[in-house]
Amino acid sequence: MIALYLRSAPARLSAAESGIAAGDAVAAENALHSLKSSSAQLGALRLSRLCEEGETIARAGQPASLASLLRASREELSLVEEWLNAVRAGRTS
């Protein structure tokens, strides 16, 4: 499950970013919804909450408001990836 997440999460966030860049709020909302759910399942709750917030903004038709939230999500995803890689390597306490 961790390996699948590490492969798919960056692509989902990129899909949200691409959706926003293209003015496709529905695509962004769908990508964020998927990332929200998978992040929550693995315990990446801060990233899940950021995605939920982004999903709400996209649904409201305000995709321009998502730029800073997507930057924060990208930073949080980087931390989650580090954490999950440490878990896979047995380096967590």
Can you say where each PLM-predicted feature lies in the sequence?
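Helix-loop segments that flank and shape redox-cofactor active sites
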Residues: 11-27
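Amphipathic, coiled-coil-like alpha-helical segments
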Residues: 6-7, 12, 38-56, 60-93
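DHp/HisKA histidine-phosphotransfer helix
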Residues: 24, 31, 69
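Hydrophobic alpha-helical segments characteristic of transmembrane helices
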Residues: 29-32, 48
